């Protein structure tokens, strides 16, 4: 599958990346996994029952739920403790395309930033 990930921070587009990876759909979850440009295995797990998202990289996992949650997550700056809160998850499908839009807040002391991931999965078999 072709996977295109666009990252926005406070509504400003900051990254646009394309990868080949896997997209798995089950009754209770959807999973997107790929190897990023730094050769790190990334897993994005969308739990349909809990309405939550987790992003795994380098044996670290960021859990994003509607209630504010703390996680230790590997970033370009090293391992950081991040407080996150899910704002919204949207899913749109058309023909051989699936787009997930995940909007969440990251809190830094008294400040917060809003991140948005647009994940477009294209079934290359069509």
Predicted feature residues:
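N-terminal intrinsically disordered, cationic/polar leader segments
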Residues: 1-63, 68-101, 105, 114
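Edge beta-strand at a domain terminus
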Residues: 109-126
